[in-house]
């Protein structure tokens, strides 16, 4: 089936690529794709194209990669060229998903139907850069995807559609990301079909109550604070997979802790102390309960199940991970 509604798409990572693929496969014309400039990545730090760029080029779509869209910003010449391209490209709506650049008011007002954002949370909870990580870290039972009519604020626009997704006890940011990407892809296609058919989408202002912000994840957050309850640390480990990973410092070496669950602890063990080692994992005392770590990684090594890790890097009961503020 083909559609007449013309969609400019702006997005960068895999989450966005899933939406672009769904829009394209549904038959909506995509005359232009905006994505972030290629970035150094991997061990060789070679320039790599975004997931959105790779998908678009493989299907012959026009791609632009401006470093900014602000005329008065750091890259005025590139911004002006991109804005001229947007003005010259006939379109009806812009769909934005994890793009990574601020859209000035000029861009928000350009499409006939405005700009629709695909946001990976149930707004107004978890506005901001890291909604998937923060939902897991906070212990939320569910999250979802919200389609929002973009305005000048940070994820403050009126809500158009939402889809709810349960957070499983073993979900990591990686697994939940994939569930939400699929949900967002379905949601945006349904919305575009409705927009084409009816000419408008019903919009509901976000409630003033329940607003929270999902701050960007920093590498410094990886260090586990063993004084916290084990349940909170288990959520942190899941929230920080694949980035930045949970981390603990033992005898001067930083170990990555990739999978863990909370188990009963011992009252006589100081937080950070290894209290048990077995084929099922390494058990570490916490402020409340204990954390059983089942997947570890030593510096320069690979992620390994505890049994394989211990075969090459023996640990001992009584060893103690350094406090987070001393790591």
Swiss-Prot record:
GO molecular function (one) = methionyl-tRNA formyltransferase activity
Enzyme Commission code = 2.1.2.9
* InterPro entries tied to this protein: Fmt, Formyl_trans_C, Formyl_trans_C_sf, Formyl_transf_N, Formyl_transf_N_sf, Formyl_transferase-like_C_sf, GART_AS, Met-tRNA-FMT_C
GO CC, alphabetical: cytosol
Q: Which UniProt keywords apply?
A: Protein biosynthesis, Transferase
What function is annotated for this protein? Attaches a formyl group to the free amino group of methionyl-tRNA(fMet). The formyl group appears to play a dual role in the initiator identity of N-formylmethionyl-tRNA by promoting its recognition by IF2 and preventing the misappropriation of this tRNA by the elongation apparatus.
For this chain, the family text in UniProt reads: Belongs to the Fmt family.
Q: What is this protein called?
A: Methionyl-tRNA formyltransferase
- The protein's gene is named fmt
